[in-house]
Every structure is written in C-alpha cells, then in structure tokens.
Amino acid sequence: MRIDIMTLFPDTLGDVLCESILGRAQERGFIRIETHQIRDYTANKQNQVDDYPYGGGRGAVMTADPLYRCWEAVCDEAGGPVHTIYMSPCGHTFKQADAIRLSKMENIIIVCGHYEGIDQRFIDECVDEEISLGDFVLTGGEIAAMAVTDAVCRMVPGVLADPECFEDESHYNGLLEYPQYTRPAVWHGREIPAILTSGNHEKVRQWRRKQALRRTRERRPDMYEKLDLSSKQDKKLLKEMEAEDA
C-alpha cells in the first residue's frame, strides 16, 4: 500500500512515520509513505500558496492551483486517479472501520489543510471524502494525517506480526480493550489479577472478555448498546457481571 501526504510541512511528518512499526514495514516493502511539499507546485516566485478569502474575513485560504498540481503529479505517478482524503473538522469522524476499509486500497492521498482551510473548488473536484478526528480544530492537518496514516497502515497485512496483535485492541471488534499488566506482579502494593498467572488460558480468555465488556459498558455505553451479546458464553459472562455488581 502507498500513502501520499500533501502538506506545507513535510518535515513534521518524517520522524513519526519512519520509526518503529511503520518504519520497519516500509523497509520490508509492506507500505510506502511519501510526503509532498505543496509549495513546490506554485507558479509564483514567492511560492505563495494562500490568498485572502472572497467575501472578507480573517486569515487566508490555500489556493486551488498548487494543490491541484501536486495532486495531479501524484495521480500521474500512480497511473490514474487516487482515492483522496482531506483532513477537515467538517468531515465524518474517523473510526476503526474506516482504517480497515482504507487499508484495503492500493493507494490513497491525504491532503493537509492550513490557515482557514483550502479552496472549496479543489475539494469539489479532487477530494473523495473528508475526515475529522473529532469535534475540535487543529492548526493544520498534519497531526490528523499522521493519526490516520498510522491507523490505516497497521491494518495492512504484514505490517504487524500477527492479526492477533490488533484483533483484541479497542474498537476492532466493537469493544474497548481489556486491562493489560506486566512485571512486577506487585507494584506500589497493587497486585495483578491472580487469574493472569493461573496458566489456564481459557479462563484468562474469558476474564479478558468480561473485562472488555465491563469497560465498554462503563465508558462507552453507545458502543455497548450495539454489541451482539446473544452467544452462550456472553450470556454467562453477563450473569457473572450482574452477580459481581450486586
């Protein structure tokens, strides 16, 4: 998979996207992440990429031409139109399901806005979807682009050592992840749950499932309401939870 990120600040992306899991995945050829300086596609000596907004108002708006030239160059290299995402507080909220969906694409482009945003005409002509990280505003799209890139890439086959690395994680299966513990067994007087050192893998699995259900119910009731808890095992765990809470 290849992800091309269009930005005014490519240096802010490199260190994060080339380290750890993503760095190793790029070295092994599972993913490729490229950044593109939008200023390189301007047609003026000042490399100006913004102008005053029509209708007045504070700030500046990124102009469509350099964005389009950059986008066109990336698409030409890919051999055709590429699914294009604009990071925007006006977009739909990014979910784990989006990460899974996008990870199945061969190429995507992520456009990072700045200032007061980008000319709507570029969005209308070139952007396939707008994505937001949540109900807040960032100075630019770079931080959001890094988050989306990381979430998408780790879903690409081969990037993580085993599917089990993400199958138990929060949001993948509609649940928040169960609590995790490591050595020492006692820290500041707090002991780990005894079940985790029992050696009984099935009981550990059931305990983790129960903790994930409990955590989701308490912290994300909106997610909990959507769960299918009709299995015999889940019904048993729910009864145990009710007894423990009584």
What are these model-derived regions, one by one?
Residues M1-V74, E202-E225:
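N-terminal nucleotide/polyanion-binding subdomain common to many enzyme families
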Residues D4-M6, E34-H36, H83-I85, I108-I109, ...:
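Hydrophobic/aromatic beta-strand patches that form the interior of the parallel beta-sheet core
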Residues S20-R24, I100-K104, C126:
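Short, solvent-exposed amphipathic alpha-helical segments in soluble enzyme
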Residues I38-Y41, H114-I118:
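Short glycine-enriched loops at secondary-structure junctions
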Residues T63-H114, Q120, P157:
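S-adenosyl-L-methionine/SAH cofactor-binding core of RNA-modifying enzymes
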Residues F122-E169:
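Structured adenosyl-cofactor binding patch, chiefly the S-adenosyl-L-methionine
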Residues I143, M155-I195:
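Internal, active-site/partner-interface "lid" segment
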Residues P184-A246:
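SAM-dependent methyltransferases
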